[in-house]
Amino acid sequence: MTDTDQQITPADATIVSTGTGTKGPEERELPESLSNDMSLCLRILRDVLGEYDPQLLATFDTVRNYAVKASAEHFAGATADPHPDEDGLAKAVATIDAMNLHDAQLLARAFATYFHLANLSEENYRVSVLHQRENQVEDDEAVDPVNELTTAYHQLLTEMGPAKAKALLEKLEFHPVFTAHPTEARRKAVEGKIRRIAELLEENKRLGGSDKKENVRRLYNEIDALFRTSPIALKKPTPVEEADTILDIFDNTLFTTIPKVYHRFNDWLLGDKAGLEQPQCPTFFHPGSWIGSDRDGNPNVTAKVSRQVARKFSDHVIGALEEATRTVGRNLTMESETTPASAELKSLWSHQKEMSERLTDKAALISTKELHRAVMLVMADRLRYTIERDADLMYHSCDDFIADLQVVQRSLAEAGAKRSAYGPLQDLIWQAQTFGFHMVEMEFRQHSVVHARALEDIREHGLHGERGELQPMTHEVLDTFRALGAIQKRNGIKAARRYIISFTKSAQNVRDVYELNRLAFSHPEDVPVIDVIPLFEQLEDLQNCVNVLEEIVKIPEVQARLKATGNKMEVMLGYSDSSKDAGPTTATLALHSAESRIVAWAAKHDIDLTLFHGRGGAVGRGGGPANRAVLAQPKGSVNCRFKLTEQGEVIFARYGNPVLAIRHLESVAAATLLQSAPSVEKTNTEMTEKYAQMTEVLDNASHERFLDLLNTPDFAPWFSIVTPLTEVGLLPIGSRPAKRGLGAKSLDDLRTIPWVFSWAQARINLAAWYGLGSACEKFGDLDTLREAYEEWPLFSTFIDNIEMSLAKTDERIAKMYLALGDDENLSKKVLDEMKLTTKWVLKIVNDEWPLQHRHVLGQAIRIRSPYVDALSVTQVLALRSLRKKVDKEELSKSQQAGFIYLILCTVSGVAAGLQNTG
């Protein structure tokens, strides 16, 4: 690879042989519909590349073929070919090595485009499978096998009886909190094109003749545009722009999907009476957001930004409610003779007249003798005035709006128009109850050290700078509480009342926040209501959390909030920093132990506890299937409420498609209910006790091995050399810096996302598995490990997630990255532990190669692997060339920028290929 005519030396491109392993059956064929979609996309992509540059197409095919042949070497046992092409990867390296910088950039974009097309094809296939399963459900089945929520509730009914099961159902809550963590490596412009291509592919199956030809022509247009669109945004998004992520998901999925989720479950609950009786499904979906309010380490999130984002969310959701109200109202065309208005509805109409005869006269003109319709149209107009903040005509709270909707609903039901009462009007009520006038609850977060420094500054200089000027950060901290108060005044207390303290070390951290909240206001009546949430995230803090909580509940402000909320309290646990701090095995076990101890402590104090799980998308940050994570929680830790962070690529994957969003919401809600089933609680408790000795050995041994790696001399600089850590920090995928703004000088200050992301890019995934192999070797009892895998949900989920991570590693590619660091000792530690962990995980799950018995997932990864390999080779060669030439001062600024752009293209492409970032 050259910037002009300089090539990487042959020594730079050396590939170390990894030997051969046992081979298994040939890769299975794809399902027909998926195969057809992927073949069509690949054919169009190849045509597009050929139209752009025939040589680019030739190189794309050459590298692709070499990589496909070579990938058999990685998947030992995944192919029956007795003579795999051992030189395939070396040939791919040589081909890429010979390219100039511009052509390498185009090749990287071509492979990245392929992954986007493969991903959307797989997503469309999953949707089609769900539709097929829906069509196969019989009307007389006791449960809907496609809707896991019905299956879970049926099990509760069986185990606990109707009364107890209903009591649990009424408590059901699912709180996803959308964050702006920079883990979505795909830019917004690309997302839009992907969505349009997915829609065209879905339409393609139903068309024929000229319509199909037109569809294919449009596919050509979109795929051509996708390839020609830079995968890298021109600049980092601002926090206000990041809010568009939530708006997109709200518009495309959530606003219309949530009522469908409720209706699907309610239809099963009521059976033949569905649509004729008051719904029994609770509004269990409660979305939150850190976007525009999480200022921990992000100086771009200011008090002004928080106000702007809150206004953006509020205006948008009220606008959506206005449109929905107008649509529902226009369809309530029942005249008074067939559907007489209730006295309550007539009273509401009179109240509306008193408020504005202009609005009621306009509505009456449109809706003569249709009072239900007229009332709804006035309500829609009032929503418009709510956005405009007209004090006389606006709704001052969403509760007032919901109350008016329920008046209309009761009137319709009393008049016998029950299907109208419990149809689209009920959808609108659910939407208002779910999203309010704020769309998502904004949760504020800041580092404990920032609060402490602000108070020190105030004590030294005076609140109003009587003894010297306050620091800008102190002003910003105080302004943050003022912004929170302003949001509450505008959109209600529900819009913003949670304040999270990162790196909570003591009860003093909580006292600091309440004190700053008071100091920010001159008048006590202006002080906003806040619930301060401690976040425990490092190993030492997890181990000490109960002692800290014991002191927190003694704080007067906390006691007041407990009394006001019926003893409700929230505690957040961080999966990311604990994993980077202690290793994945120790972090998993420490979190499980902390949860159990917090639950016992809460029970002692009669506290209604909610545990907030700070999970990432990648396994190294607590990622993995959310429903399995719920079912693996300790007894009493969920209590029919599950709250977690949703970020980056996870948001798009879980909520980007309406059908898949329904599936995800039902699955998590089902697990949240089922976790309180006596059988599940019994299993989790007994298995935790049964395998306590095993987990102690695994914990200690894995922690020792992990710390041995981190404490090796020069590990931190070596890590930055053998991964694209520096380049990942340059990706314009989020407003947040890769390092905390408190003086990042080591791994301790590095955020967990680039830690996980960088290891994934190097095809090592170290953050997900390092230390487990040594721990299993130390324990040595394979039979017990296998029993734990079969019997204990926590352990089986943990092992399955690690097996998936190992399936995405590649020793051949990893060696190329590790060679960048020129440290045989550290490289050997990583590779030896990778082999040892792979050996033990495969023994535990009784597989010959990763994901052997999880066919669909394993096959998807195997098919993608050669294409990811090509991008990884391009990336590692570019990294090596860039760093050597920068050291020798051989590159101009434009050439250096070209290399960085190439690396960023490969980073985006590999992230799309692996389908996870951080």
Regions found by a protein language model. Name each.
Residues 38, 56, 104, 243, ...:
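Active-site-proximal structural scaffolding
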Residues 571, 603, 645-781:
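Ligand-binding clefts of soluble mixed alpha/beta catalytic domains
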Residues 367, 373-377, 417, 422, ...:
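Active-site cores of enzymes that catalyze phosphoryl transfer or operate on phosphate-rich substrates
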Residues 269-287, 479, 510-515, 547-558, ...:
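Conserved alpha/beta core surface patches that mediate binding of polyanionic ligands
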